[in-house]
Curated annotation (Swiss-Prot):
This is Prothrombin. It holds the Pfam family Kringle. The lineage of its organism: Eukaryota, Metazoa, Chordata, Craniata, Vertebrata. Residues 108-186, 213-291 form the Kringle domain. The modification 4-carboxyglutamate is found at E49, E50, E57, E59, E62, E63, E68, E69, E72, E75. Residues 44-89 form the Gla domain. It is found in: Secreted, Extracellular space.
């Protein structure tokens, strides 16, 4: 500015002070007089402006200002940092004044566009931007912690790293990590980059077009589709190979197995399928648009009075029917879900009553330490080199482990692990300590990822099986969980009923290194209520399918809890009041942040995919 900043005496004030000094008998001024002389005085543009707080428009818009002058006007370090980032970006636009004002407002881009603070959230090709706070589908290396002054709000386009292409964002398309946005240029009739919409079919399909759907998972389908989703031709049902494979299968005789057309004779929740040429037992699913039918809507409205009595301790017996072939599945199913240190000793753990009572009343953040032996089916998926915890998983027999597909394969995070990259640690309680004589370390023989796992869009069918090289011995700390049948899924998967999530994931959402209080020392447990499907769908822009459900507390419920990074792949379990067994209803899949208001954790619906589990185990279990 034109004048010198510092201590100044305006004309009349200086004259008065001089007169006081001349006529005074004292050399030094009284404290009150001294303070009045040393008070900083601003140049007046209007009458009495000396006594106002700093005026940002006068200081920095009408004339050039320094950081200190901006701070004096704003009186806040945070506000000054945000303003200064925009101001330095707009400095080249000092004239005309209206251009600088527009630049500071942030609704247009100046230079590299680091000043932009508008609400555009679509990239130049029409892809919706990913939330800056989210790690899905991409893990951002730039966030509000690394760039606190960049105003990384919601999913608005910004330029925190001074990219030469202007404001940009991470995208919701897993195949496109980041892309620039088309932003108006300050003072010009143009944009930073031109819009170039992608051709149809290449963008993320957040709202697929409606078309006639096939009901009942295709069990009544009579069409002529005869090719799998991978383009393989179906074998004729009357062929020798297909007949041999179906000989011991429990097929519905009402389903007509005509020629080589895709059919659903075994009630597979995945829909129609067929055998294909290749290894004995090879099969493939066929691509149809199925009507969404929630399991809980198909067979009932939850538990009845009998279950209330069971919860109250009067009756709790129900014969357990095994589902898998022990020759391929291994041992453990007949005894599944009955924990050696609890049910087998007629003991309850400290929080299971909360789950059972919820059936009557209708990443673990805010969780607590699990009791030893509380979750004996919990498995730690461990990377060999560098050694690190990758995910959770669950033991379903002495040979098979269940986890989320994205723990093994997720290209946006450079994940594509093989059996040689990983091992599993079973029976653990401590996150880091080797628990001698308690935990078992097992190598993997083979990984099987669901063939229709959709990492490109929404993690649909986020499920994988891992076969152990050698069967693991059961103990007080190692025991398999049950997988639900239709009746169990229909009765327990009700909105408001609580399930349990366990894991060694982060205790809170953080962008900093996972050290100290950010990670637990022992296995964590949290009980979470299942949420109504419409609420789940309304909580996110991501397309939700009937292979998913969500759980968590609503903002007005007064309780908190969620799975967090590191809990992925772990089990969501519920205890049946009918037979006192624990069932794995879900697999920790994805969420937008950890324990955020209005956001919920999403889980793979295990029962929906149980027939796929059976087919894989029957084919590769020997």
């Amino acid at each position: 500015m034109a004048h010198v900043r510092g201590l100044q005496l305006p004309g009349c004030l200086a004259l008065a002070a001089l007169c006081s000094l001349v006529h005074s008998q004292h050399v030094f001024l009284a404290p009150q007089q001294a303070r009045s002389l040393l008070q900083r005085v601003r140049r007046a543009n209007t009458f009495l402006e000396e006594v106002r707080k700093g005026n940002l428009e006068r200081e920095c818009v009408e004339e050039t200002c320094s950081y200190e002058e901006a701070f004096e006007a704003l009186e806040s370090s945070t506000a000054t940092d945000v303003f200064w980032a925009k101001y330095t970006a707009c400095e080249t636009a000092r004239t005309p004044r209206d251009k600088l004002a527009a630049c500071l407002e942030g609704n247009c881009a100046e230079g590299l566009g680091t000043n932009y603070r508008g609400h555009v959230n679509i990239t130049r090709s029409g892809i919706e931007c990913q939330l800056w706070r989210s790690r899905y589908p991409h893990k951002p290396e730039i966030n509000s912690t690394t760039h606190p002054g960049a105003d990384l709000q919601e999913n608005f386009c910004r330029n925190p790293d001074s990219s030469t292409t202007g404001p940009w964002c991470y995208t919701t398309d897993p195949t496109v990590r980041r892309q620039e946005c088309s932003i108006p240029v300050c003072g010009q009739d143009q944009v930073t980059v031109a819009m170039t919409p992608r051709s149809e079919g290449s963008s993320v399909n957040l709202s697929p077009p409606l078309e006639q759907c096939v009901p009942d998972r295709g069990q009544q389908y009579q069409g002529r589709l005869a090719v799998t989703t991978h383009g393989l031709p179906c074998l004729a049902w009357a062929s020798a190979q297909a007949k041999a494979l179906s000989k011991h299968q429990d097929f519905n005789s009402a389903v007509q197995l005509v020629e080589n057309f895709c059919r659903n004779p075994d009630g597979d929740e995945e829909g129609v399928w067929c055998y294909v040429a290749g290894k004995p037992g090879d099969f493939g699913y066929c691509d149809l648009n199925y009507c969404e039918e929630a399991v809980e809507e198909e067979t009932g409205d939850g538990l009845d009075e009998d279950s209330d009595r069971a919860i109250e301790g009067r009756t709790a017996t129900s014969e357990y029917q095994t589902f898998f072939n022990p020759r391929t599945f291994g041992s453990g199913e007949a005894d599944c879900g009955l924990r050696p240190l609890f049910e087998k000793k007629s003991l309850e753990d400290k929080t299971e009553r909360e789950l059972l009572e919820s059936y009557i009343d209708g990443r673990i953040v805010e969780g607590s330490d699990a009791e030893i032996g509380m979750s004996p089916w919990q498995v730690m998926l461990f990377r060999k080199s560098p050694q690190e915890l990758l995910c959770g998983a669950s033991l379903i027999s002495d040979r098979w482990v269940l986890t989320a597909a994205h723990c093994l394969l997720y290209p946006p995070w450079d994940k594509n692990f093989t059996e040689n990259d990983l091992l599993v640690r079973i029976g653990k309680h401590s996150r880091t300590r080797y628990e001698r004589n308690i935990e078992k370390i097992s190598m993997l023989e083979k990984i099987y990822i669901h063939p229709r796992y959709n990492w490109r869009e929404n993690l649909d069918r986020d499920i994988a099986l891992m076969k152990l090289k050698k069967p693991v011995a059961f103990s007080d700390y190692i025991h398999p969980v049950c997988l639900p049948d239709r009746e169990t899924a229909a009765s327990l998967l009700q909105a408001g009923y609580k399930g349990r999530v366990t894991g060694w994931g982060n205790l809170k959402e953080t962008w900093t290194a996972n050290v100290g209080k950010g990670q637990p020392s022992v296995l964590q447990v949290v009980n979470l209520p299942i949420v109504e499907r419409p609420v789940c769908k309304d909580s996110t822009r991501i397309r939700i399918t009937d292979n998913m459900f969500c759980a968590g507390y609503k903002p007005d419920e007064g309780k908190r809890g969620d799975a967090c990074e590191g809990d992925s792949g772990g089990p969501f379990v519920m205890k049946s009041p009918f037979n006192n067994r624990w069932y794995q209803m879900g697999i920790v899949s994805w969420g937008e942040g950890c324990d955020r208001d209005g956001k919920y954790g999403f889980y793979t619906h295990v029962f929906r995919l149980k027939k796929w589990i059976q087919k894989v185990i029957d084919q590769f279990g020997e």
